[in-house]
A protein has these predicted regions:
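Polytopic transmembrane helical bundles with strong interfacial aromatic enrichment
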Residues: 1-149
C-alpha cells in the first residue's frame, strides 16, 4: 500500500490500474444498460435508486483502489461512458430505425421511441454530475479532506 491524501490506496502496477479502470467502465455500462432493459427500467423510482447505488458503490470501490482525486474522475468517466453508450447504442440506432420505417410508409415501433426517450432523459440529468466530477480535478476541496468516506 502507498500513502496519499486520503490514506491508503491499492498497490497496483500501471497495467493493473489500467485494466481495473477500463474493465470497470465496461462493466459499469453493461450493468447500467442491463438495468434499463429489464422490467426495472419501467419503474423510474426503483431504477433511479439502483443506478444511484451503482454510482455510490463504484465511488467507494474506486476510493479503495485509487487516490480520491482519481476516484472522482473514474466515477465521472463511468457515468460519461453510460451517456456515450446511450447515444451511440440506443438513441441514434433507434432514431435510424424509426426514420427507416417512416420512409417505408410503416408505423414506427413506439418502443423504440420510449427507449430513446428514457436514455435521453437520463443523459439530461447525468450531465451536471459528470461535469462536476470531471472538473473536480481542478478543485482540491472536492477530493481532499478528513471525511471522504
Amino acid at each position: 500500500m502507498t500513502v496519499n491524501q486520503k490514506g491508503k490506496v491499492a498497490d497496483l502496477s500501471v497495467t493493473q490500474a489500467i485494466g481495473v479502470s477500463l474493465g470497470s467502465l465496461a462493466l459499469g455500462w453493461f450493468l447500467y444498460d442491463f438495468l434499463c432493459k429489464t422490467p426495472i427500467g419501467k419503474n423510474l423510482v426503483l431504477l433511479g435508486l439502483l443506478v444511484y447505488a451503482v454510482v455510490v458503490l463504484s465511488a467507494y470501490a474506486y476510493s479503495e483502489l485509487f487516490s480520491s482525486r482519481a476516484a472522482l474522475l473514474h466515477v465521472g468517466a463511468m457515468v460519461a461512458t453510460w451517456m456515450t453508450g446511450n447515444v451511440f447504442f440506443i438513441i441514434i440506432p433507434n432514431q435510424k430505425k424509426v426514420v427507416a420505417s417512416l420512409q417505408r410508409g410503416e408505423a414506427p415501433d413506439p418502443l423504440l421511441g420510449q427507449q430513446a426517450k428514457q436514455r435521453s432523459t437520463h443523459n439530461n440529468y447525468l450531465t451536471l454530475p459528470v461535469l462536476f466530477m470531471m472538473l473536480s480535478n481542478h478543485y482540491p476541496m472536492t477530493f481532499v479532506g478528513d471525511d471522504l468516506w
